[in-house]
Structures are given as structure tokens and as C-alpha cells.
Amino acid sequence: DLVLHSVTKYLAGHSDVILGALVTPPTDAGRALRERLEQHRLLHGAIAGPMETWLALRGLRTLHLRVERATATAGQLASRLGSHPAVGRVRYPGFGAIVAIEVAGGAEAAERVAAACRLWTHSTSLGGVESQVERRRRHPAEPATVPEGLLRLSVGIEDVEDLWRDLDRALRA
């Protein structure tokens, strides 16, 4: 097996590096694959620069703290959003820092909520220290199975009460 990690997201965690990592298993086949990948990298120059690797290492040092904080905050927000009158549905598996909500009122209401957020960055990315909101169905390429009013919330490490006040205010706007 070969595992591809997006170091850009949670591993680096500060939205300031674009990097990936390939991980091979500690087996004979895995070692053979790794040797082939290293040869390809050597011939084609696909290596990360020193600044990118330093930024990734910096992020790895705080990964456990960031994930712990963001996960706890996401759980609290998901619980509160479940009883909010402007939210039709909350999608949260009970772990992790991604919460999806369906805003009552569909696409226009979801756009208004996203635009009204002040602490939440309106962005497609995820896994950073800053909280981000995105309406997933904005782009024509999104499948019709994605609800029109769906907002994806990538929860960062800000104070839960600050994030809640901002979301609540935006949902009531």
C-alpha cells in the first residue's frame, strides 16, 4: 500500500505551505516501491525546499494540540448548532474538526450566513489554525447530491465562545 498525506492541511496546520508526503509500508514490496520513488525524485528533482520542510516540521510539533483543541470546539459547536432554528441539519460524526450544516432557506440563506461571518474565513481549504466556512455547492462541478444550503465549517483553534457568537450572529442575520 501507498499512503499519500496532504501535509498542507492538518500536518503543517498554518495555511502557509504546499506539500505532500508519500508513505510506504515496512515490507519488502514497500521498500522496493520506495526505492523506485526515490529514483524518480532524484531524476526529476521533485523535492521540497528547506523553508517548506521547516514549516511542516513546525506544524508537526503542535499537531496534537491543534487537533485536540479543534476537535473539542467542533463537538461543542455541532451540539449547539443542532438546536439552532436557522439550521436544518448538522452533519458531524462525533470526532474531528469538520462540521457540515444545512442552513434552512437553501443557497441564498447559506451565502448570507457565510458572508456575514467575521471570524470565519470564507475559504475552500481546511485544517489550519483559523476557522473557515465554505458553501460547497457554489461551483457548477459540485454534484447535485450536495445540498444547496450546505456549509462546511473547518474549525480552528480560536475560542469556542467567540466562534459560537459569530456563527449565531451570522445565522440570525
Predicted regions and their residues:
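PLP-dependent enzyme catalytic core of the Aspartate aminotransferase-like
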Residues: R66, S131-A173
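Active-site C-terminal subdomain of aminotransferase-like
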Residues: L2-R135, A144-V146
